[in-house]
């Protein structure tokens, strides 16, 4: 994912947390805030409690890959931050994708293209 699609500055993170709305499931929390740009931007947060640097970076790479694959179905004009919760480090890629897309659907950031995919429900 290109750098202009990422939230990088602390000021931007703070604004999203303070002024944005949050949505969550058991594995992820998503904060979102509308922006005036013509594209979405995403920030990632993975706590040190989830594991060592290798584990945290693997989680971030997987999240970026899932978002890259869903890029065409994500709404524009929104900044959002994905926070990984405890337990996400034990998930495989498919289960992580299912959980992340579920919380993005809750927040209405992700909209299914032609409706060919079945609805997924996560505990």
UniProtKB/Swiss-Prot annotation:
GO molecular function per UniProt: 3'-tRNA processing endoribonuclease activity; ribonuclease P activity; tRNA binding
Q: Which reaction does it catalyse?
A: Endonucleolytic cleavage of RNA, removing 5'-extranucleotides from tRNA precursor
What are the alphabetically sorted keywords of the record?
A: Endonuclease, Hydrolase, Nuclease, RNA-binding, tRNA processing
Q: Which GO terms describe its biological process?
A: tRNA 5'-leader removal
Enzyme Commission code(s) on record: 3.1.26.5
Keyword tRNA processing part of the UniProt annotation: yes
Provide a GO CC annotation, any one.
ribonuclease P complex
Top-rank EC class of the record's enzyme: hydrolase
SUPFAM superfamilies reported in the protein's UniProt record = Ribosomal protein S5 domain 2-like (SSF54211)
* A Pfam entry, by short name: Ribonuclease_P
Top-rank taxon: Bacteria
Q: Which InterPro entries match?
A: Ribosomal_Su5_D2-typ_SF (IPR020568), Ribsml_uS5_D2-typ_fold_subgr (IPR014721), RNase_P (IPR000100), RNase_P_CS (IPR020539)
Family assignment from sequence similarity: Belongs to the RnpA family.
Q: What does this protein do?
A: RNaseP catalyzes the removal of the 5'-leader sequence from pre-tRNA to produce the mature 5'-terminus. It can also cleave other RNA substrates such as 4.5S RNA. The protein component plays an auxiliary but essential role in vivo by binding to the 5'-leader sequence and broadening the substrate specificity of the ribozyme.
Describe, as the record does, how this protein assembles with itself and its partners: Consists of a catalytic RNA component (M1 or rnpB) and a protein subunit.
Record protein name field = Ribonuclease P protein component
Organism, per UniProt?
Streptococcus pneumoniae serotype 4 (strain ATCC BAA-334 / TIGR4)
Q: What is the lineage of its organism?
A: Bacteria, Bacillati, Bacillota, Bacilli, Lactobacillales
Q: Which gene encodes it?
A: rnpA
